[in-house]
Every structure is written in C-alpha cells, then in structure tokens.
C-alpha cells in the first residue's frame, strides 16, 4: 500500500513512543499528529500500555523476550483504552510544532508558491529532508504530482480531497514514490498542512518542472 489516510502504520506510533523516529522532522510531525488526533493518541497509549506490560514480564538482566511483532499480537489481550475529548486551541499551530519553532528560533514566513498557494519552509535536515507548511485557498486544485522520495502530510486547518478520500484536521497522509496526488482543497475555507518531504516532487508538466527550480520543492 502506497498511501494510508488518516492514521499511520503502527510502526510509526511504536517508534514515536520509544523515541526512535529517524529525524527531528518526523518527531515534530508525528507529535503534532498525536496531539491533534484522538485516535492516534489512543493508539500510542495502547502501544505504551502493551510495552509496559511485557516489560514487567521480562526477567531482570536478560534480553527482552519479545519483538515488535509480539507487541502487536498482544494487543487483543488488553481492554480497549477510552480516549476522552480534548480541548482544541483556535490557532492552527499545534503545541508540538510551536515548541519546535521556538527552540530553533524560527518564525513562519509565507512565500508565494502559485495562484492561491503559499509555503513556509521551517526546517531542513542533514539529508535534505524538508519540513514546511502549505496554505491553500478554498477550491484550489493543486497540480498533479508524484514524489522522488516520500512525504507525510498532516492537516492542521481546513480539509482537502486526494482523489476520493477526504483529509481533515489531525489526519495524516503518507505517500511514497508509487503514489500520485490529485488534490483539491475543500470549498469551506483555507487549508493549512504541515508536510515532511524527502526528495523532490515529481511533475510531468514541463512548465511545472521549470518552476520547481524556484520553489525548492
């Protein structure tokens, strides 16, 4: 599967809970996703509960007698975790992202990306990984594109459609090199997303390929 809407695979939540995600960019985006999504937060708490239970079963000073697959298999033995409602702030910037920007002394500066589109570059990793914001006006159709790498997209405000699937605040979409986006912003209001991109976007349109030199994406 090249794309999975709304939630990530469990491996992402396990790595987040264990503090073993691959980069600061992944840490920030997944933390923001968990902050905004009751379902994601509940999943992390379930996995933490499973891990804690299995750790208590491990003999002292011996290797852990279970693997990541064992954690997932043990899930059915535990009662479901109830997740209550969480008060949301009006601002579109989640605390996880705000804390990160404050720590690296970065402010959000919007730049023109195209008609009805603005971007704000936030962070670049040592391998060229980019964390950035996209702001799109209602009804805008984003040019069809693919990826020469991977991308995580988290909705902070508003909503968009990728093909027949809608993504709303707290939802996250993962795309790899096999995915092709056909994105349209909902008519109800502007949409702001946090994206983490590895590799450049891939366009078939030669004009967009030329414009890509100026966007840095």
Per-range role (PLM):
Residues 195-217:
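Amphipathic alpha-helical interface segments
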Residues 115-147, 176-180:
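Conserved short histidine dyad/triad with adjacent acidic residue
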Residues 142-144, 163, 181-187:
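Short beta-strand His + acidic residue motifs that chelate non-heme Fe in jelly-roll/DSBH
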Residues 179-203:
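Ligand-binding loop in jelly-roll beta-barrel domains
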Residues 91-125, 129:
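Charged, low-complexity intrinsically disordered boundary/linker segments
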Residues 1-8, 24-28, 32-38, 42, ...:
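Positively biased amphipathic helices and basic secretion/translocation or surface-docking motifs
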Residues 162-182:
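Short acidic-glycine-tyrosine-enriched beta hairpin
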Residues 137-140, 146-162, 169:
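Glycine- and acidic-residue-biased ligand/ion/polar-headgroup-sensing regions
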């Amino acid at each position: 599967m090249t794309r999975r809407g709304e939630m990530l695979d469990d491996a992402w939540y396990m790595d987040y809970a264990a503090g073993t995600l691959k980069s600061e960019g992944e840490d920030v985006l997944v933390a923001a996703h968990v902050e905004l999504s009751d379902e994601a937060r509940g999943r992390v708490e379930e996995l933490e509960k499973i891990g804690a239970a299995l750790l208590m079963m491990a003999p002292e000073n011996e290797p852990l007698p279970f693997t990541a697959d064992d954690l997932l298999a043990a899930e059915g033995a535990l009662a479901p975790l109830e997740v209550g409602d969480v008060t949301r702030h009006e601002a579109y910037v989640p605390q996880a992202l705000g804390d990160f920007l404050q720590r690296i002394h970065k402010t959000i500066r919007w730049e023109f990306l195209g008609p009805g589109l603005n971007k704000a570059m936030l962070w670049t990793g040592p391998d060229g990984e980019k964390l950035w914001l996209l702001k799109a006006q209602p009804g805008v159709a984003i040019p069809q594109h693919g990826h020469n790498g991977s991308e995580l997209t988290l909705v902070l405000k508003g909503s968009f459609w990728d093909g027949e699937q809608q993504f709303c605040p707290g939802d996250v979409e993962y795309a790899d090199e096999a995915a092709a986006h056909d994105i349209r912003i909902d008519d109800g209001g502007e949409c702001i997303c946090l994206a983490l991109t590895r590799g450049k976007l891939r366009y078939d349109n030669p004009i967009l390929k030329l414009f890509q030199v100026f966007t840095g994406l």
